Each structure stands twice: as C-alpha cells, then as structure tokens.
From Swiss-Prot:
Changing H1163Y: In strain: MT4251. This is Glucosyltransferase-I. Keywords: Dental caries, Glycosyltransferase, Repeat, Secreted, Signal, Transferase. GO terms for molecular function: dextransucrase activity; glucosyltransferase activity. Pfam families: Choline_bind_1 (PF01473), Choline_bind_3 (PF19127), Glyco_hydro_70 (PF02324), KxYKxGKxW_sig (PF19258).
C-alpha cells in the first residue's frame, strides 16, 4: 500500500507550520513499470505499458485486507496534539498487498487456449478501504484546528450588513437584498459569500488535497483504447467531444467477464475518463440514479471512492447492454448527462438576450487548429448604411449603422465572393423555377421579397438589382418594372433613400406609416397618439398629395407574418402560459394555447393583446396614394387554423375596401385633421380618376370615382351641436350624391355593397363639392371592430364594372430609375398570402398551394396584382427557433428544395407549380421569398475555432468561448438539392450577363467569384452560428496542457489522456511542501494554466503552484481566494470600499462599459467598478450597488435626491422636464436632482412635491398658509384668475398667485373669500366691523340695493355699499325696519330708541300707518300717520279711544287722565262711554 503524503499549513500556538499527513492509497496493479511523475520537463509522449501490468485475482483479497487494516491503524495511532512527520519514502508494494481486482479477465493465451474465466461480486473491501481513507483524512485534518475562520466569524458579527440566519451568515445590501457571489475584505480578512449568499470558509485548509495515482483505477488496463487510429473513435474532424465513443481493448461482458472488443464494441468516453474529478463525481451520481444504485457522493468524496463507484457503474452498464443487446439507451443517457454539465451546455456559452437565439459565435479567420474553416472575408455589418465599413453620411434618418450581422442560425458570409456568386445562382433558380424544375416557364416566379436586408451584406442588393435589370429589363420601362416588382424587408429608415440612390430597382416598406397606424389606431386607448401622424409621418406628406409621381416608391402595411403577430403570441405565452420562455422558443402546445387567448381577444371590445381598429388601418392603406398597399393574410383569415378556413371579424370590411379600390380609388389625395367636440378626427379624400387637385373638374369617370374616409380614434368622441365636419370632395363632385361604403354601428362595421343597399343613407355635396357631417352622423364607438369612428363614402352611380386602375406604360424610362410610384404602381395591390402560424395540412386538399390554386378568382376579384408566397423551402425541424418549430419556411437547410424531396408546409413542388400557373392565369404576379441571411442546422458537424460574440460580431466580455474549438452544425449532406443545383447556372449566367461578374462589389472591392460551385455548405462559407448549447468545453482537451485530444494520423498533434493509453499518472491536488500542485485527469501537471473542477477554477503558475490573492496573468488581472478558488462572475469589495468585478472567465473588468444582460451595463475605471453617481466623459451617470447602470429610470441617490438617467446613454438629465411611468412630471435641476417646492422655470411659476412630482391641477398651501393653484395642463401657477375645485368651490388667485381672502373687488365685482380661499356664494358674511354682506349664489358678487331672503325665510336689505341695513329704513317708498343682525322685521312690534312703537306688516314689512293692529295677545294698537303707536286719548275715525303708554288700546277699563278725570272705554269697541 502506498503512503499518500499530504502537506497542510497548520496554526500551532500562533505559528504556522507545515504538517505532512500520511494516508493509505490502494494500488491495484504492480509497480514494475514505476510511477512516472510529470515535472517541468514532462513530455507528451505517451507509451502504453499494459504489457507490464499483471492481474490481481480475488484469491489474494485476504492479504490485502490485513495489510490495509494494519497500515490504517498505524496512521491513526499518532498523537493527536503533536505535529508528526511521517517518512516520505515509499517501498514497492507487492501485488499481494494490494486490494484485489474484483473481476477476472477472459482472454486467449498465446497458444490459443482460453484462460479460466472467473466471476465475482463487487469487492466490498476495496470500497471499505477507500471510505476509510476518507475518514482517516478527515480525522487527520482535525488534529490541529486553523483558527482563521473563527477570526473571520468575529469580523462578520461586527459588520452591520451581515445577518446570521439559521447559523449561516448573509450579506445584505442597502436595499435589503442578499448579495451572492460576493467577496469583501474587512480588517485584512477575505470574506466570501457563495452563490447562495451564505458565508463560506475559503481558507487554505479547504483545498481538496486528494491525489491518487491512476494505477488505482480498477479497469485502466481494460479500458485503454484499442489503438490510436481514427477508426477507434467517434469524432468530429479528428477531435474528441463530450459525446465521443471509442473502442476499448476489452469489454466487461455481462458485467462480469473481460473479453477482447470487436470493431462494433464502442463505449462512451465518459464511462472511462472525465475532464475533472468534479465531473466524474457528477457522472457517478447521475448514473447511480439512472441505474438504481442508491448512493450519492459529495464534494468530500475522494478519488479512489469515485473510481470504485465508476467501476461499479461500468459493470452495471455492461450487464444491461448484454441484456438489451444494444447501446441505444446508453447513448441517450450519456447525452442527457452531458447536457447537465455547464461546460457542455449553454451555461458556459453565456446566453442572454443579445441575439434572437440568445447568442452567437464568430468563426476565426485564422484558426490554426481548424484551417479548413478559415476565410479571407467574414466582413461584418455591411448594411446599406455601413456598406463600405464607414457610416454613410448621406443617410441620417437612422443614426445607427442600420442593422447587425448575426440574426439566426448559420449566418451566411455574404461578403465572400464565392458565396455572392452562389446567391446569384440561387436567385436565378427561383426566378426560373418553373422552367428548371417543370420545364414550364409559366410557373416561374416573377419577383422576389428580400428577407432581413439589414442583416446581410448590402452587396446583395446590387447583385439582385443588377440581375433584375439584366434578366428582366426592369430599368427599361414601367411595365417591365411593375411586372417584376420586388420588395425588401428593410427596417432602417436609411434603407429607402439608399435604395432610391441605387436606382429604385426594388421598393421598400414605408415603416413610418406603419408606426403611425400602430400608435394612432391599433394600440390600446391609453397608448394612442394623436391622429396627425397618419397624415404627415410617412414617406409621403398626404396633406395635399397631388404629384403625378411620388419622389420615392414604397409599399405599406400594418401587420406581417413576423410583425405584430409572433410578438403578440410571445407576449401571451410569457404572460399567461410560460413566464420562463426565452425569446421566441415556443412549443406547439404553447402556441396552441396562446391562440385560444389571441382569437378570443380579437373578438373582445377591450383588447389585451390584439390590434384595435384593423379596419380603420386598411381604410387608409387601401385608399392612400403614393404607396402600394400590402394586405396581410392574417387580417382576413385567422392566423391559426387551416389555410383560408376561418375568416376574421375584419374580413368583410377589408374585402369591401379591396373591391371598392378597383372602382373608386384614384386621383389626388388630401388629408385633414379637425378638432371637433372633445376630440379629433381625420378625413382623407381621393378626388377621382383624372383629378389631382380639389380644383380639377375632370371628366365623367372622375365624377363617379373618388372616395372619402373619416376616422376617429377616441371611442368617447362627441361632437358639439355646432360642430361641422366638412369634407371637400373636389370641384368635380359639386351637388353630387354620396353613399356610405362602410359605417360604424354599435355592433361593429356595416358594409354597403351597392347603391341600392345604401339608398336611405345618401348624402349630397353642396355647390362647393363639400360633404358636411354633424353630431348626428359622427360619434365614437367601442366594439370589437372599432374603438373610435370609421366612415367611408363613395359616389352614387358608378357602373358595376367600373375600373379606375391604370395600366403601366411601355414608354422608355429615362430618369435612371427602375420603379416609379405613379398611378400605375398605385393601382397595384400586394397580398402577403400566408401566416407563420397556419396549421399543418391533414390532407392533400388542405395544403396552402392547393387552396391558392382553387381561389385565384377571389384574389382577382380583390384586385390583387402581386401575390407574395410563403417561403417554399422544406423546413428544418431542429426546434432551435420559432421558425423551425412552426416550419414556416424560413428555417431551412436546403435552399433549392422547394418541396422537391418531400412536401413542405405548403405542399409539394408540383403543387407550387400549379399554384403559380393558376395565379398567372388571372394576371397575378407571383413573388418568391429570397432568404439569403441564414441556414439552419445542417446534418453534418464541423469543429471550428470560434469566439462568443453579440449580434454585431463584437466579442462578449466574460465569455469562456474565445478562439476555442466548437462543434457547429455547419456542413450540408452533399446529397441534397444544393448538391444538384448549387453553382449549376453560373456558367450560363456568365455567358448571358458578363457585366454581373465584372462589377466590383462595394463591401469587398472585388467582383463575385463564380469559379467555385458550392455543392456542399461548410463553415468556411459562414460567419458563424447561434450558440448551440454544447458549451465551451464540448471539444475535449487536457486542462493541464491546454491541448485538445486529437486522433489524427499526424503524430505531432495526436494526443490522448494517459488513462486511455494505460499509462500511469497522478490525478488531483497535492501539497509538496512548497505549495499546491495539480495533475489533470489526463495525467499531466498543470503549469501556466487554469484548471476547473466543475464550476470551480484555479490557476497554477510557471512552476506548477496554485496561486492565491490578486494576480496578473498575461496582462490580465484575476483574483483567487485563500483556497485558490478563482472569483468568477463575482464582485469583490475592497477594504477601501471600492468594488471590482470578475467576469465569467475570471477576468477583472478594467475600463469602459460592459453589457451583462439585455440592456444592463456596468462601467469600470482602472479595474474599479463604478457605483453611485459617477462622472464619465463629463456626463454624470448612476450605477447601483451591483454596479448596474441606471437607464431610463428614476433613482434616489445617496443624498436622498431623485434623479433620472437617459434610456439610451444613461446620462443624468439636467435642466429638463421628465415624465414618470404614472404620467407625472418632474423637473431636474442644474445638479440633476428633482426640484421641490416653488420653482420658476422658463418663466413659469411651478410647484413640485417633496417627491419631485410636479403639481398639476392641484391646490398647494405653503408654509405661510398661502394657497396656490397650478394649472392642470401647464402646471403654471394660476395668477389673476378664478379656479374651481372638485367640490365646485371657487378661488381667485392674485397677481402673486396666492388665493385671496376677505372682501375683494375683482373685475368690477365685489366678492368675498373665506380664510381658506373659498369664494363665498349664496352666503352671508359678517366682517370684522360686524357689517353683514351677502354674496350672490351664482356670480358671488356682493348684493347691493337689493333684498335677500335667507334659508329661514328672513329678509335682508343691502345698501349701496353692500352692507345689510339696520334700524328704520325707507326703501322703495316703504318704511321698513331691520334688526341689528340685519333681519327685516315683519309682523312684529318695534320700539325705537325714543320708546316709540312701530309695527311692520307681516307680508310687506312696511311700517303700519293710520291703521289698527292687534297683537298676539289680542291687544290693539293704532299707528299714526308717522307709523308710531299712539298713546293717550285719541279720536280715530270719529271714535274716542284711549291707548296706554305702551300703545295698547284700553277696552273695558276706566282711565283717569292727567286732570283727574275718569273715563270708561267700551269693552268691545273701545270707544269712550259717556256717563251722564
């Protein structure tokens, strides 16, 4: 038994000492060959020594057990508390002293006689010994405890951001979020928090020091490769991969008996060899689970345990192979295991949203190990804007370079002259498909749609344009150009002017109009813009479009097969079906469920996903001048379901518009925006054939043609009674009857197909040719078809067969342009005749091309002139992107297979021929889809040298894939249609059109190269591919030497693991007294290299020792923890509070910006990660605690202030307004902080809350109690103006903007405002002098010279000064009296200050004069001519009466006057009674 000597740093009485610990290592073969230790002079020479290896039999087991036990007892008997050194000398172990091999070998002796076969069960002693070694090591490790971790724990407990939870320590950032993969240095100590966020001890003592010789591998002799030739391996270009199989020398037949292998006996390389111990451990655990072995190994398991476990698994595998008699199951199992390893899956490819398939790789042009894949080209991003490699200064509408190179799959190198010639060859094939395939020119395509223009070399546009001119003569006249009208899918705003400058050989989309339709009509109400963009935001300003020929030709649309369809489906899937979906990687089941939601939503009034107002968009598209409309199949028929099987709710409206276009749509165009009622509408008029302007009178046809479209995008639209919508139909249409073609109703859109159907709805123009509509005609609607308003009107009296379309001219074109946007081009209609999501046919009759052929009459009735076919290519089914899932034709591996080898989604090649011929029979031109950007996974693989890049081809920082070998699906079969037709027409094309091959292409400066016919695609013709999920380490290499395993016949590069060659070696970490060294699983010592154990990485220097701490390696900065573990994708917080970030490859990011995920960036300066407010190139930017840059968001910075950072640049906004997500506005001052309180900005007096939000439409009370109001629109402080609050109360704000209080004279009115600023209306007010005023209930004006009755029915009178009068008053000839509180006296007695009593009438309130009055007690008074109650003896109306001093008349009483005379007054009449 070997003594395994392991050295450790131990702390003993505060001193570090080196301790060597011996542990048992089982040796399962003889040492006669000696142990060869790789040193600095180690050679890669590999010689098999299997002839020197003897076999251990089961009979020797007892000797081994005794020896192992005694050695273990000796090792464990050392005194625990002392430092002991055990001799490092090693004696040669007799084979009988070694743990026996549990299996025997069945082989043929030299004399031909078969050896005795022996079979045993798995040797439990071996496993027990391995387990004991692990236990012994653990016990030895605890002899002396390193107290450095204890010191770390003391520091952790003092850190305010660290919390202990369930015995573990976590670091929380200032937002309360647990930091993961985070390291900080505090008090000189390195504290590391792992991927879970928990603190992890990374002291030197945690290094795995388990080193084993490969002689302990039970089956090494038998598992060695049969020979080193390529025939003994499954390989790719002579390189081994994680899924490579090989032929071993022996097979453990039935899991029991070793037998020599045959040429059919291949086994997975991963059954025998693994790149690291960690990979082996995971393999063992994975296979145990697959094979029903109930045992799991963790990262404390030693190498010997894993070897024994792997041997057990191998025996199980072989037994199962014998039982099943095949290895198919094993291939599936191994492949599944491979996909679990980060080095062999997308985890190590660093996928994120920088590409439609999550990432791309670029092939190196000078790969030394893959010269067959090199290229002199791969010139990237040569878009129309950037064709020369520099941004063309002529084109400024798009300030980017107008696109990017890597779109999808195998990215074709369209800068390669050989490839360019092949693209021309393919284009010629498409344009002559009928002739070539069916010997029928009537089945040829007439034109092309160029796919993904902004992702290919723009040289292709010249190549295609030159071909169309040479072969089809499109530059000669309009008829030739229109007969071969080709279009581009080019999204950059620079592409159309570029195309125009290139001669308008093809036309591009009017993307501005598409966006206008989208945001003015199709979006939800709260996202809609105004309607004016529909008039002006386009390639054509349609305010008054009266030109014979537009400046630039174009086509227009609102939706397409891949625009506003698959993105909506994606949104549905992500929101309601699978929130974890990435990009466009859907399953068919997810798509099916999404369409159930999509189709239901289409029928809803309040839509969540689908477009609003589709019919309104088409009403403009199909009546607009100066652009060719393209109708999308999915707007007339459901996107899913069988072809043309199910109509949408918009079908009738669109069909009606298509048919009406033939009869009516012609002449000049005028559009207007009118503000009416509470919203706006737009009108669009076509004047009719022969009339370009409103003043043109035209002819008879003019009068019966033309159209008016009226649209609104507000469902709450209401016109005022006085509003008039005036639509000027033009001078040709004076006093003419018009009828509706389409009108909005409560239930949707009503179509009127004839004059008779609309007879009751006829309207007439006036003598100026104006149609006038009122509130009775136009209002907003909300239903599944319309969210707003639509009305389309046409003249009455047009013949049923009227056709106002214009034929193209054959007169020679002389302006150097091919396509002209004139009346003839305006007359064309394109039909995009497919949906990405239409169902797969279940029978012949359902194939798209079969259905098309049956419906050509319908297409002709619609006026379709150009039928855009789906891409007819047989689809890839690799499922790597949506296109290959739904098999729409854009994902293909053979560009010449148009249903030739088998039916595609749309039918067979013969079906295609019939469909084209049927369309041609109706005069409809047919357009092919030319897709030169990409090709999907080919059936054959190549090893390429690749670098992980973003969509522009720029290397992705932090990726492990940097000029590494990578397996790509880049080679076609050589037996497909490409092999037949590739390059086949180049000689013919050179003979017919030599000028095509003489032109030097712009991006390369050289012509196309027709000398090579591409019969088989391979990597040299591609720029690269999407990441394939195979990982950075799929092509296997030895970590220690960084040499790839290769089985080439060239001995210079033929290289294999020592294990496969039955050579002895060491494996794992070891401490040699100076430092830690490492031997790879291939048997080589690591020097000047990184080593990975699973996801853990280390570096070993020039002397082979593991490094720790900060290191500069080849000019790059790295950081390694005390146990050698490299920081990767980790943040290090230095003791000075600064941060550093170490990427996926462990490199410290040094300077500049780096993208980490879609739209997320970090910035670095000399290795320091920017955190907080940072000045960069004079601009202030913000980075959070994780270093992520704030873009397009508000941030509360450390000073507590709110700031906003630009969505694109990340620069802090200064001195400008910004709107937040809630639609609230903030103003950012000179320092970038959101201002608060009162502010004067640009002459406006504004107010901002403490949170920075601008006050609009609200009242604000300042610290002095002053009230202000800020306008609901501008936010300006209201001054010298009235404002009414939500409760209907009014305020008036003075010249300073403060609400006035008290009595005020405003605009000649005398008003009053309470202390809270509220104007008094319909209320009484008593001022500080006690004066009472009343303010009118409507105007609020102080009442003057007027009576007012209060709520209790009491009356007041306010004098000329507006104050309530008191006391006796003569008003309007009446003598009245008002109490001290201003209340008029009515029906009451009043005694004045002189004691005079008056009475005021209960109705009029007039003072009673010359009249009797009886009070409530029945007493009578008489008031004289002055209105005072009389007293004493009075003669009234001839009666002698008497009234007391209080005015009460005496009745039935005696009275003695002042002279002592006694009188008596009658008890009834009160008259004095004479006494005789």
């Amino acid at each position: 038994m070997d003594k395994k000597v392991r050295y450790k740093l131990r702390k003993v009485k505060k001193r570090w000492v080196t301790v060597s610990v011996a542990s048992a290592v089982m040796t399962l073969t003889t040492l006669s060959g000696g142990l060869v230790k790789a040193d600095s002079n180690e050679s890669k020479s590999q010689i098999s020594n299997d002839s020197n290896t003897s076999v251990v039999t089961a009979n020797e087991e007892s000797n081994v057990t005794t020896e192992v036990t005694s050695k273990q007892e000796a090792a464990s008997s050392q005194t625990n508390h002392t430092v002991t050194t055990i001799s490092s000398s090693t004696s040669v172990v007799n084979p009988k002293e070694v743990v026996s091999n549990p299996y025997t070998v069945g082989e043929t002796a030299s004399n031909g006689e078969k050896l005795q076969n022996q079979t045993t069960t798995v040797d439990k002693t071996s496993e027990a010994a391995a387990n004991n070694i692990s236990k012994q090591t653990t016990e030895a490790d605890t002899d002396v405890i390193d107290d450095s971790n204890a010191a770390n724990l003391q520091i952790l407990e003092k850190l305010p951001n660290v919390k202990e939870i369930d015995g573990k320590y976590y670091y929380y950032d200032n937002n309360g979020k647990v930091r993961t993969n985070f390291t900080l240095i505090a008090d000189g100590k390195i504290l590391h928090f792992d991927e879970t966020g928990a603190y992890t001890d990374t002291s030197i003592d945690t290094v795995n020091k388990d080193i084993v010789t490969t002689r302990s591998n039970l089956y090494k002799k038998y598992n060695q490769v049969y020979d080193r030739s390529a025939q003994s391996f499954e390989h790719v270009d002579h390189y081994l991969t994680a899924e490579s199989w090989y032929r071993p020398k022996y097979i453990l037949k039935d899991g029991k008996t070793w037998t020599q292998s045959t040429e059919k006996d291949f086994r997975p390389l991963l059954m025998t060899w693994w790149p690291s111990q960690e990979t082996q451990r995971q393999y063992v655990n994975y296979m145990n689970a697959q094979l029903g072995i109930n045992k799991t190994y963790d990262d404390t398991s030693n190498q010997l345990q894993l070897n024994i476990a792997a041997a057990t698994i191998q025996a199980k595998i072989e037994a199962k192979i014998t039982t099943l008699k095949n290895t198919d199951w094993l291939r599936q199992t191994i492949s599944a295991f491979v996909k679990t390893q980060s080095a062999w899956n997308s985890d190590s490819e660093k996928p994120f949203d920088d590409h439609l398939q999550n990432g791309a790789v670029l092939y190196d042009n000078e790969g030394k190990l893959t010269p067959y894949a090199n290229s002199n080209y791969r010139i990237l991003n040569r878009t129309p804007t950037n064709q020369t490699g520099k941004k063309d200064p002529r084109y400024t509408a798009d300030n980017t370079i107008g696109g990017y190179e890597f779109l999808l799959a195998n990215d074709v190198d369209n800068s390669n002259p050989v490839v360019q010639a092949e693209q021309l060859n393919w284009l010629h094939f498409l344009m002559n498909f009928g002739n070539i395939y069916a010997n029928d020119p009537d089945a040829n395509f007439d034109s092309i749609r160029v796919d993904a223009v902004d992702n290919v070399d723009a040289d292709l546009l010249q190549i295609a344009g030159d071909y169309l001119k040479a072969a089809k003569g499109i530059h000669k006249n309009d008829k030739a150009a229109n007969d071969h009208l080709s279009i581009l899918e080019a999204w950059s705003d620079n592409d159309t002017p570029y195309l125009h400058d290139d001669g308008d050989n093809m036309i591009n989309m009017d993307n501005k109009l598409r966006l206008s339709l989208l945001f003015s009509l199709a979006k939800p109400l709260n996202q809609r813009s105004g309607m004016n963009p529909l008039i002006t935001n386009s390639l054509v300003n349609r305010t008054d479009d009266n030109a014979e020929t537009a400046a630039v030709p174009s086509y227009s649309f609102i939706r397409a097969h891949d625009s506003e369809v698959q993105d909506l489906i994606r949104d549905i899937i992500k929101a309601e079906i699978n929130p974890n979906v990435v990009g466009y990687s859907f399953t068919m089941e997810e798509i099916k469920k999404a369409f159930e939601i999509y189709n239901k939503d289409l029928l809803a009034t309040e839509k969540k996903y689908t477009h609003y107002n589709t019919a309104l968009s088409y009403a403009l598209l199909l009546t607009n001048k100066s652009s060719v409309p393209r109708v999308y199949y999915g707007d007339m028929f459901t996107d899913d379901g069988q072809y043309m099987a199910h109509k949408t709710i918009n079908y009738e409206a669109i069909e009606t518009l298509l048919k009406a276009r033939i009869k009516y749509v012609s002449g000049g165009q005028a559009m207007r925006n009118q503000q009416v009622g509470n919203s706006e509408i737009i009108t669009s008029v076509r004047y009719g054939k022969g009339a370009l302007k409103a003043t043109d009178t035209g002819d008879r046809t003019t009068r019966t043609s033309g159209v008016a479209v009226i649209e609104g995008n507000n469902p709450s639209l209401r016109l005022k009674a006085s509003d008039r919508v005036v639509v000027n139909m033009g001078a040709a249409h004076k006093n003419q009857a018009y009828r509706p073609l389409l009108l909005t109703t409560d239930n949707g859109i009503k179509a009127y197909h004839s004059d008779q159907e609309a007879a009751g709805l006829v309207r007439y123009t006036n003598d100026r040719g104006e149609l006038i509509f009122t509130a009775a005609d136009i209002k907003g609607y909300a239903n599944p078809q319309v969210s707003g308003y639509l009305g389309v009107w046409v003249p009455v009296g047009a013949a049923a067969d009227q056709d106002v379309r214009v034929a193209a001219s054959t007169a020679p074109s002389t302006d150097g342009k091919s396509v002209h946007q004139n009346a003839a081009l305006d007359s064309r209609v394109m039909f995009e005749g497919f949906s990405n999501f239409q169902a797969f046919a279940t029978k012949k009759e359902e194939y798209t091309n079969v259905v098309i052929a049956k419906n050509v009459d319908k297409f002709a009735e619609w006026g379709v002139t150009d039928f855009e076919m789906a891409p007819q290519y047989v689809s890839s089914t690799d499922g790597s992107f949506l296109d290959s899932v739904i098999q729409n034709g854009y994902a293909f591996t053979d560009r010449y297979d148009l249903g030739i080898s088998k039916p595609n989604k749309y039918g067979t090649a013969d079906d295609l021929v019939k469909a084209i011929k049927a369309l041609h029979s109706k005069g409809i031109k047919v357009m092919a889809d030319w897709v030169p950007d990409q090709m999907y996974a080919f059936p054959e693989k190549e090893v390429v040298t690749a670098t992980r890049v973003d969509k522009f081809g720029k290397p992705v920082e932090g990726s492990q894939i940097k000029s590494v070998l990578y397996v790509a699906d880049s080679k076609s079969s050589g037996k497909d249609q490409q092999a037949k037709y590739g390059g086949a027409f180049l000689e013919e094309l050179q003979a017919k059109y030599p000028e095509l091959f003489a032109r030097k292409q712009i991006s390369t400066g050289v012509p196309m190269d027709p000398s090579v016919k591409i019969k088989q695609w391979s990597a040299k013709y591609f720029n690269g591919t999407n990441i394939l999920g195979r990982g950075a380490g799929y092509v296997l290499k030895d970590q220690a030497t960084n040499t790839y395993f290769n089985i080439s016949d060239n001995k210079e590069i033929n290289f294999l693991p020592k294990t496969l060659l039955n050579q002895d070696s060491q494996v794992g970490f070891s401490y040699d007294g100076k430092g830690y060294v490492y031997y790879s699983t291939s048997g080589y010592q690591a020097k000047n290299t990184f080593i990975s154990e699973g996801d853990k990485w280390y570096y070993f220097d020039n002397n082979g020792y593991m490094v720790t701490g900060a290191q500069s390696i080849n000019g790059v900065n790295y950081y390694f923890l005390s146990n050698g573990l490299q920081l990767r994708d980790a943040i290090l917080k230095n003791e000075d509070g600064t941060y550093a970030y170490y990427g996926n490859d462990g490199r410290r990011y040094e300077n500049g910006y780096y993208q980490f995920m879609s739209g997320v960036w970090r910035h670095f300066n000399n290795g320091e990660m920017s955190v907080g407010l940072t000045v960069i190139d004079g601009q202030v930017q913000y980075f959070d605690e994780m270093g992520y840059q704030a873009k397009g968001k508000f941030v509360t910075t450390a000073d507590g202030k709110i700031r906003y950072f630009d969505k694109q640049s990340g620069n802090m906004y200064r001195n400008r307004f910004i709107e937040n997500e809630e639609g609230k506005w903030l103003y950012l001052g000179e320092d970038g902080a959101a201002v608060t309180g009162s502010q004067t900005i640009n002459g406006q007096h504004l107010y901002f809350r403490a949170n920075g939000v601008q006050v609009k439409g609200e009242f604000v009370t300042d610290r002095y109690g002053r009230i202000s109001y800020y306008d609901s629109n501008s936010g300006d402080q209201i001054r010298n103006r009235f404002v009414r609050n939500a409760q209907g109360q009014w305020f008036y704000f003075d010249n300073n903007g403060y609400a006035v209080t008290g009595a005020r004279t405003i605009n000649g009115q005398h008003l009053y405002f309470r202390a809270n600023g509220v104007q008094v209306k319909g209320e009484f007010v008593t001022d500080r002098h006690g004066r009472i005023s009343y303010y009118d209930g409507n105007s609020g004006d102080q009442i003057r010279n007027r009576f007012v009755r209060n709520a209790q029915g009491q009356w007041f009178y306010f004098d000329n000064n507006g104050y309530a009068v008191t006391g006796a008053r003569t008003i309007n000839g009446q003598h009245l009296y008002f109490r001290a509180n201003g209340v008029q006296v009515k029906g009451e007695f009043v005694t004045d200050r002189y004691g005079r009593i008056s009475y005021y009438d209960s109705n009029s309130g007039d003072q009673i004069r010359n009249r009797f009055v009886r009070n409530a007690q029945g007493q009578w008074f008489y008031f004289d001519n002055n209105g005072y109650a009389v007293t004493g003896a009075r003669t009234i109306n001839g009666q002698h009466l008497y009234f007391r001093a209080n005015g009460v008349q005496v009745k039935g009483e005696f009275v003695t006057d002042r002279y002592g005379r006694i009188s008596y007054y009658d008890a009834n009449s009160g008259e004095r009674v004479r006494i005789n």
